[in-house]
Structure formats: structure tokens, C-alpha cells
Design a protein with these regions (language model features):
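Acidic, surface-exposed loops and disordered segments
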Residues: 14-270
């Protein structure tokens, strides 16, 4: 038995080394959000294969606390669009995927097996949401590796109550992410990212000085398109565009209220 285990380990190591040589990471380095898609259907076999592979993501206790609702029909996309602020890609993408934190399925399994579930609480929602988001990112990476384009819609948690109603989500199921998917019909400029040293912390978190912030955000603030945003919005700094225009406190507080209400409605909060 020891010899068999050793042989299996050696084979696994060889496979990993082979895979490492073959993997081309350029698609990740060059990735960008795609909002315009060709009117070309995604084969169900491909979509199902990508989702099945995505489900290999890490999951709490191997419970797989997520479900995915696939939307293809134009009338269903039209119903979802207002919940996503009528962003055009919701209705023009061949496929819209709603990833949900789901303790409904697992809880029903428990009850069917003489076990009493206790997952109607915030910590359970966070665990299920983490599972769902890990799967979401896994799917996005796999989809892009197969030549598809994706757009991550942050609006899902802004209007979860509407999505719950439209998709008929039962108790202990909560939408946490929406992805539009299709074959790209555009090649937009790649968005900027903060420098590595602005994000990494060795051993402990090192809080930022004003000088650190100046250095980390210098390139972002110097970009012509970002300077244009400042000008057209009649603001003094790029940060003000975020705080005063794009992500305002009043909006955040209102949507937080909707989120809390929906979590309670779906059984994750008292």
C-alpha cells in the first residue's frame, strides 16, 4: 500500500509540473470587463461544463452552499434589468447567471436525514455567500479562458429583494452576484490596478501614511480618463467622484436597509 501511495504521489507531481508548463496566464494578465456581446448562443454543453468545473472551488465543509440561476429567455432578462439599473448588458448578453448563497438545499437534506439544521443566522449567510463568490470567480476565470467575456454586476446586493421575487428564491437563498456572459463584441481598454506594494502587507497590517496614499494612487489619478471624470463632474479630486457621485453615503445607507430587510425576509437574520 505504501508503494502504491508513493507511485500515485509521483504521478500527481509529474502531472502538476506538466500542467504548470502548459498553462498560459496571459488571459488573466490581459483580462477586462466585457459589456458588449455577439448575438451568438453559448452552447449548453460548454456552459454546463464551465459551471461544473467552477463547482470545484473551495467550499465550507464540502457543503457547496450555493445555487446558480441561468437566465436565457428575453422576457426574464427584461424582468431582471430594472434590478440592475437597466444596464444594457443584462438584456443583450446571451446568458445571465445569478449566483446565490443557498442553505435551503442543505437544510432540507438535514431534515430528511433526522438532523436539525441551525443555519438561519448571519454567520451562515456569510459562509454561504463566501462559497457562492468563490464559485463565481472560478466560473469567470474559466469562462475567459475559453474565450468568453464576462461582466460582474455589483447591483445584485443593491436590489436583492427584486431579484428574490423575480427568480422565486425560497427562504435561506439569497442572491449575491450576477454575471453576464457571452462572446466578446468589443475590446475595451484594460482598467488600471493599484501597484502591488499598495496592497500587500508582510506579517501584519501596516497602516497607510498620507505619503503612502499619494504614492499608491498617483498613477490612477494621473490617467487622462480619470482626470476627465473629475472635470465633467465638476469636482476637485477623483476621490470626490466616488464619494459624491458614484457611491454616495445616502445611497449606501438606503441599500444597506434593503439588504438587511431582505436577509430577514430570506431567514438569515432576525
Amino acid at each position: 500500500m505504501h508503494i502504491v501511495k508513493r507511485v500515485c504521489l509521483l504521478l500527481w507531481m509529474k502531472m502538476c509540473k506538466f500542467a504548470e508548463k502548459r498553462i498560459n496566464m496571459d488571459f488573466i494578465k490581459n483580462r477586462r470587463t466585457i459589456r458588449k456581446y455577439k448575438q451568438e448562443e453559448i452552447p449548453s454543453t460548454l456552459l454546463n461544463s464551465l459551471l461544473e468545473e467552477a463547482f470545484r472551488a473551495s467550499t465550507m465543509g464540502n457543503m457547496q452552499l450555493y445555487s446558480v440561476v441561468i437566465t436565457r429567455e428575453p422576457d426574464m432578462k427584461a424582468k431582471l434589468a430594472p434590478a440592475h439599473f437597466n444596464q444594457p448588458m443584462v438584456t443583450t448578453a446571451p446568458v445571465v447567471l445569478t449566483f446565490c448563497a443557498d442553505f435551503n438545499r442543505f437544510s432540507k437534506w438535514c431534515k430528511c436525514r433526522k438532523a436539525e439544521p441551525g443555519y438561519d443566522n448571519p454567520i451562515s449567510f456569510i459562509n454561504a455567500a463566501s462559497d457562492a463568490l468563490l464559485v463565481t470567480q472560478n466560473f469567470c476565470t474559466l469562462a475567459e479562458a475559453h474565450g468568453l467575456g464576462i461582466c460582474y454586476l455589483g447591483t445584485t446586493i443593491y436590489n436583492p429583494d427584486q431579484i428574490v421575487e423575480i427568480l422565486q428564491l425560497p427562504e435561506l437563498v439569497m442572491p449575491v452576484a450576477t454575471i453576464t456572459v457571452g462572446y466578446p463584441d468589443e475590446c475595451p481598454a484594460q482598467p488600471e490596478r493599484l501597484p502591488l506594494e499598495g496592497i500587500l502587507h508582510e506579517e501584519v497590517y501596516h497602516n497607510y501614511t498620507d505619503q503612502d496614499i499619494d504614492r499608491i494612487y498617483a498613477a490612477k489619478e494621473a490617467m487622462p480618463e480619470n482626470q476627465h471624470f473629475v472635470t465633467i463632474n465638476h469636482k476637485e479630486t477623483l476621490a470626490q467622484v466616488f464619494t459624491d457621485i458614484r457611491y454616495k453615503k445616502a445611497d449606501n445607507e438606503y441599500m444597506s436597509g434593503v439588504l438587511k430587510k431582505t436577509l430577514k425576509q430570506q431567514g438569515f437574520a432576525k
